[in-house]
Amino acid sequence: DSLGSAMDDTCRRNIKRAEEQIQSQTARLTNCSAVPAVLEKAYFDSVGRAAELGNADAQVCYVQGNFSIEISDQQMERYKDNARNFIQLGLERGDWRIVNLLAQDTNVHISGFLGSVSSRSPIDILRMNRLLRHGATGGYAQFLDTNAKDLAIRLGNKAQVDSANSWAQEEYERHFHNSPILNSEPEDCKEAELHEETPGQ
């Protein structure tokens, strides 16, 4: 009996020790999983601050909206307001990166926050495609033309296609005639560089 009792005590101690180890490891894993979320939130906040201060690269990253975080409805409304403002500023400074973000087919390519402010209309995508085409050359120009043909077929309305071309011509002459020639798709957000610049913000 005493032997059995001793074995029971040993067993209970082992079980308790195992439970404590499980709890400890669970806590460590929980803390580890929280670290990326904290860093991502800090990145979101720092990019937003830099964008509001006029950093063009930060504005592109902010508009692109590839943030793996959950935010409140109020924060999302603020993102939308800021992103629309940064889009307008990007167009006014002739920033091809902003145009390229808006030229993506939102049903296929856009994820993250950008889908909340980017139009899902083929006519708007075509406008941005045609604007890019004014600055494009070589294989990239051919790529844009192919996409434009597909968009025109989806629209099925020559008047809308003509309107998109006219808008793109006017916008190019107004803001983009001095922008660099495009031999390939413009780079969007240089996320790695921004991460390096804002680790402690």
Go through each PLM region and give its residues.
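Secreted/processed peptides and extracellular or luminal domains of membrane proteins
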Residues: R17, V38, Q64, L194-E197
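TPR/TPR-like (Sel1-like) alpha-helical repeat modules
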Residues: R84, S116-A141, S166-Q169
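Hydrophobic/aromatic side-chain positions at a characteristic register within alpha-helices
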Residues: V35, A50-A51, Q75, G90-L91, ...
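Short coil/linker segments at helix-helix boundaries
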Residues: D1-D45, S68-N85, I110-I123, D145
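Short helix-capping/linker turns of helical repeat alpha-solenoids
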Residues: M7-N14, Q21, A51-E70, F86-I110, ...
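Terminal, low-structured helical/coil segments at or just beyond the last alpha-helical repeat
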Residues: A136-Q201
